[in-house]
């Protein structure tokens, strides 16, 4: 899910959609180019799910889409290789997620972990 917001309201650490990918904002720079030009903002961000850097330059009064990012808890049901089967603790739905390399060996069966959900995609939460 997503909602509209103005570019001037974006802040570091918040989220924005660039190239149909939810991204976390790393920096926002505002500039006024000239006497008759409108102020512009450069937004640099990193993709939540693919980790690639993206940037956009837009007028500050332009509308842009912001993803609704939810952090939820889930219990690890089973682990097979680098895949973990999880059950959401709120609605008891089950799903599989790939375990990132930095978390492999640290996640055990029966533990409760955090994950992020945005625009139909899921990922283990950055804050473990």
UniProtKB/Swiss-Prot annotation:
Q: Which GO terms describe its biological process?
A: positive regulation of translational elongation; positive regulation of translational termination
Primary location recorded for the protein, binned into one broad class: cytoplasm
Sorted alphabetically, which PANTHER family does this protein's record hold?
Answer: TRANSLATION INITIATION FACTOR 5A FAMILY MEMBER (PTHR11673)
Q: Which residues carry this modification: Hypusine?
A: 35
Coiled-coil ranges from the UniProt annotation: none
Annotated keywords? Cytoplasm, Hypusine, Initiation factor, Protein biosynthesis
> CDD domains per the record?
S1_aIF5A (cd04467)
Family classification: Belongs to the eIF-5A family.
Signal peptide residues on this chain, from the entry's feature table:
none
Function, as annotated:
Functions by promoting the formation of the first peptide bond.
What GO cellular-component annotations does this UniProt entry give?
A: cytoplasm
UniProt subcellular location? Cytoplasm
Q: Which Gene3D superfamilies match?
A: 2.30.30.30, Nucleic acid-binding proteins
Record's keyword annotation contains Zinc: no
Q: Which organism is it from?
A: Methanocella arvoryzae (strain DSM 22066 / NBRC 105507 / MRE50)
Molecular function per GO: ribosome binding; RNA binding; translation elongation factor activity; translation initiation factor activity
- Which protein are we looking at? Translation initiation factor 5A
Q: Which domain of life is it from?
A: Archaea
Q: Which PROSITE patterns match?
A: IF5A_HYPUSINE
Q: Tell me if Cytoplasm is a UniProt keyword of this record.
A: yes
């Amino acid at each position: 899910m997503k909602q509209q917001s103005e570019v001037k309201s974006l802040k570091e650490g918040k989220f924005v959609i660039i190239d149909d990918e939810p991204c976390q904002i790393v920096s926002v720079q505002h500039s006024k180019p000239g006497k008759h030009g409108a102020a512009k903002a450069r937004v640099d961000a990193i993709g939540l799910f693919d980790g690639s850097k993206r940037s956009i330059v837009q007028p500050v009064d332009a509308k842009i889409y912001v993803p609704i990012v939810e952090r939820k808890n889930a219990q690890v049901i089973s682990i097979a290789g680098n895949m973990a089967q999880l059950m959401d603790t709120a609605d008891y739905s089950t799903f599989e997620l790939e375990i990132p390399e930095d978390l492999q060996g640290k996640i055990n069966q029966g533990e409760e972990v955090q994950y992020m959900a945005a625009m139909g995609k899921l990922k283990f939460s950055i804050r473990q």
